[in-house]
């Protein structure tokens, strides 16, 4: 996926989950943050960031904060909408006969439903932006929705669907994602139960470009 236009900035602070103050060309701008997660280990004062320039003149904010430079790691794409977009592009190249985003299964909306021949597939997508000592972790904040989705996938797997949870690693040099049990042990338990039921765990490694994010490798978890 590609962004329309990118500007460079320096992160100042984040008054709330939705906005941040960023210095752009010597002036402090209020920008929209495309990730409501905490991201405390990423958004440090003085850190270099990348902003997508909005083409909507009616918007209150001119910029969206989409990437941040993490010391010792490199650029991290922190756009929470990016994982589903890149997976949609990636799935289109995987030979499925039919792909439907935002598929209702049970009481959940699963990110993707696919068909290939007679086989039906479900895939839930999780974006990973948290790195500690060279390992990716998910979630960075408790997610009851994420736990619920894993239970739904395990149930669907038992009913004949081929199910997968795909972790999109939104940074380079990281090849695996582990459940962040210190933040939410329930997610780790649900992931283990889903794997035991036959749900596939995928790590999707990405190239983080200046104005793009692209899946370049798939690994089994």
Question: Where do the language-model regions lie?
Answer:
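Short aromatic-glycine-enriched beta-strand elements
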Residues: 16-21
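Flexible glycine-rich surface loops and low-complexity tracts that mediate binding to linear polymers
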Residues: 44-56, 205-206
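Nucleic-acid nuclease catalytic cores
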Residues: 134-144, 154-183, 205
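Domain-level recognition of nuclease-like catalytic cores that cleave nucleotide substrates
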Residues: 170-221
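Acidic-basic catalytic patches of nuclease active cores, encompassing PD-(D/E)XK
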Residues: 40, 72-101
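Beta-strand/loop nucleic-acid-binding surfaces
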Residues: 27-41
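Short nucleic-acid-contacting surface segments enriched for D/E, G, S/T with interspersed K/R
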Residues: 37-50, 154
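Conserved catalytic cores of phosphodiester-cleaving nucleases, focusing on short active-site segments
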Residues: 9, 110-140, 153
